[in-house]
């Protein structure tokens, strides 16, 4: 058994998550974690809501609530959505816990002690109308590198480069359209140039990465400069140095603290499990691989910023140093970044109304239909487009007509003719029977190898190819025509049921909810594919602060089945099954498109009204 770390990108708690988000970080990470558990490995899968930074402050101001109140609301919304999607976290927590604050401040102090954090000055954007610091991502302009319009003050989505707001050409505020002014202010900086050689050397040893991810990551080191890791803001983690720790208007930059969440969540999990040091098996052992799942817009922070923070903490940059009390931290084994998913040909944008939220699609359609679509048509290695027509087609033609119908056919024939799993009569076996069983057994190696390589689309295709071959076997053997040879009939149905069971094991990481139904349809008892649940907990260091976490029990041999062919149980009762998957009415496509158009129009009108109101306030102030 090996320890496997599965770190999942932290959704930002300024609104609900949409399908584009979970296509990048959610379903792929869960498929991988479930597979590794079935392989017998000890998986620790963590994440949480990212709750600091100026965007939450700005949104809270709009709504007339505190940042903590806004974060509390969306922490709960996001946790419920991801739990309902079946993402099997060992712990899904949040960044506003005292535990997270302590770990972040320990990281900062040791990086400072090792000489990789220093004090300097930087220009910051100020709103002329309010005098307040403007969030980097709320400033837009022309990218100075690729000259794309709409680049943000923290990053250009077109070329992927990190930016500072004062680097933008013709910058304007997204909040009210005014031109910001820039002032020098004191900040702490992470000395990325002093860490670049070690970071790049680590990158060049990476194997098995998606070429686009590795090439982009290496390209980040063509020109490396220090990055400010503090902000002029009153919402975030206090800066743990004298003269700053009590300053209400200086806080750590959200991206410095958010990536440390993987470590702090692991420590919180260990503390809640009753063994406070258990996390070290995943973080202080070089033999333990860590896999990070995200969308491609987060590559920079996971292949440059977070590794640099760990190298600085470890004392492994050009200035030397030594690790702090957390010990030497293991750098990522692999950054598994997906491309972007669009919606009906348009880029997902919550603010522009181009969106389908997780909670909305799950309220209307089965969860495994959503998971299947993301796995089969998601943006694994190239951009993909979510369309309602393709979503309905995948559900109806693949899940319902092929896989679901196969399970129902086999279970129905067994229930009708035997009422229980019949035995194999060796003398009645044919080469065709043996070939199918050999194929379904061998599929564990081929499908598993593809999941190991993070080629989940290919893995799913191979599993569904087996489903197609089982359907062909049923059609070729025609068990409904075997009237006078019960031993041959029983053998055929046993072979078919065993192959279906094997296919169900292969599909379990992708379709955990329906795999339980298939297991039961073939006479299986107990839990086949465990699901996560929500628990209400108290902050470990501030008992007055309560919040929901996603967690679960996933134990091989108890509620996790192995990644291999398990013999079905002869004599297990089988009754007439209910359909595993229901078809979606074709008219749902037009209904969803009409709903999308109506929502898009309403959101655009609301955003325009808000912007007009802001401009009116500015105009009134100038008169």
Curated annotation (Swiss-Prot):
CDD domains: Anticodon_Ia_Met (cd07957), MetRS_core (cd00814). Belongs to the class-I aminoacyl-tRNA synthetase family. MetG type 1 subfamily. The keyword Transcription regulation does not apply. It is an enzyme of class 6 (ligase). This is Methionine--tRNA ligase. A motif ('HIGH' region) lies at residues 11-21. Its EC number is 6.1.1.10. A motif ('KMSKS' region) lies at residues 347-351. Disulfide bonds: none annotated. ATP binds at residue 350. It is found in: Cytoplasm. Its main location: cytoplasm. Zn(2+) binds at residues 143, 146, 156, 159. Monomer. GO terms for cellular component: cytosol. Its cofactor is Zn(2+). Keywords: Aminoacyl-tRNA synthetase, ATP-binding, Cytoplasm, Ligase, Metal-binding, Nucleotide-binding, Protein biosynthesis, Zinc. It comes from the Bacteria.
């Amino acid at each position: 058994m090996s320890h496997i770390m599965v770190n999942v990108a932290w959704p930002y708690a300024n609104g609900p998550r949409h399908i584009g988000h979970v296509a990048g970080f959610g379903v792929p990470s869960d498929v991988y974690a479930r597979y590794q558990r079935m392989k017998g490995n000890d998986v620790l899968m963590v994440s949480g809501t990212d709750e600091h930074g100026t965007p939450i402050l700005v949104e809270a101001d709009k709504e007339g609530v505190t940042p903590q109140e806004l974060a509390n609301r969306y922490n709960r919304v996001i946790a419920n959505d991801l739990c309902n999607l079946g993402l099997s976290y060992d712990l899904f927590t949040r960044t506003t816990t005292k535990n997270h604050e302590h770990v972040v401040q320990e990281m900062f102090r040791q990086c400072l002690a090792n000489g990789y954090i220093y004090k300097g000055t930087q220009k910051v954007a100020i709103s002329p109308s309010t005098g307040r610091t403007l969030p980097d991502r709320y400033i837009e302009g022309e990218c100075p590198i690729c000259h794309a319009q709409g680049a943000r003050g923290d990053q250009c989505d077109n070329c992927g480069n990190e930016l500072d707001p004062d680097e933008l050409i013709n910058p304007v505020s997204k909040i009210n359209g005014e031109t910001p002014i820039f002032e020098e202010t004191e900040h702490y900086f992470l000395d990325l140039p002093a860490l670049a050689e070690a970071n790049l050397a680590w990158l060049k040893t990476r194997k098995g990465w998606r070429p686009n991810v590795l090439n982009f990551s290496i390209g980040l080191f063509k020109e490396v400069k220090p990055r400010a890791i503090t902000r002029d803001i009153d919402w975030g983690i206090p800066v743990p140095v004298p003269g700053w720790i009590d300053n209400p208007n200086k806080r750590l930059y959200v991206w410095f603290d958010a990536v440390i969440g993987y470590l702090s969540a692991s420590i919180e999990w260990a503390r809640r499990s009753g063994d406070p040091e258990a996390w070290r098996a995943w973080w202080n052992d070089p033999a333990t691989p860590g896999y990070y799942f995200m969308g491609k817009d987060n590559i920079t922070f996971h292949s440059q910023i977070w590794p640099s923070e760990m190298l600085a903490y470890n004392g492994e940059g050009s200035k030397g140093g030594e690790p702090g009390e957390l010990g030497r931290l293991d750098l990522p084994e692999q950054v598994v970044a997906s491309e972007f998913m669009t919606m009906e040909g348009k880029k997902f944008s919550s603010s522009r109304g181009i969106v389908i939220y997780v909670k909305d699609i799950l309220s209307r359609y089965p969860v495994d239909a959503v998971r299947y679509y993301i796995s089969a048509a998601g943006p694994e290695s190239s951009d993909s487009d979510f369309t309602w027509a393709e979503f309905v087609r995948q559900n109806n033609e693949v899940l319902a007509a092929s896989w679901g119908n196969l399970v129902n056919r086999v279970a129905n024939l067994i229930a009708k003719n035997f009422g229980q799993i019949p035995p194999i009569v060796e003398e009645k076996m044919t080469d065709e029977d043996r070939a199918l069983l050999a194929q379904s057994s061998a599929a564990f190696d081929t499908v598993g190898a593809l999941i190991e390589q993070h080629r989940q689309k290919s893995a799913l295709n191979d599993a569904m190819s087996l489903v197609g071959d089982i359907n062909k076997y049923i059609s070729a053997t025609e068990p409904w025509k075997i009237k006078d040879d019960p031993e041959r009939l029983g053998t055929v149905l046993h072979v078919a049921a065993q192959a279906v069971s094997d296919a169900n094991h292969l599909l379990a990481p992708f379709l955990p909810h329906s795999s339980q139904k298939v297991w039961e349809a073939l006479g299986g008892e107990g839990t086949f594919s465990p699901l996560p649940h929500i628990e209400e907990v108290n902050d470990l260091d501030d008992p007055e602060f309560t919040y929901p976490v996603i967690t679960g029990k996933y134990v091989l041999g108890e509620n996790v089945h192995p990644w291999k062919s398990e013999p079905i149980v002869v004599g297990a009762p089988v009754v007439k099954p209910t359909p595993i998957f229901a078809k979606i009415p074709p008219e749902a496509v037009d209904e969803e498109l009409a709903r999308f158009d109506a929502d898009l129009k309403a959101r655009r009108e609301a955003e325009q009204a808000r912007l007009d109101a802001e401009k009116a306030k500015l105009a009134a102030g100038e008169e």
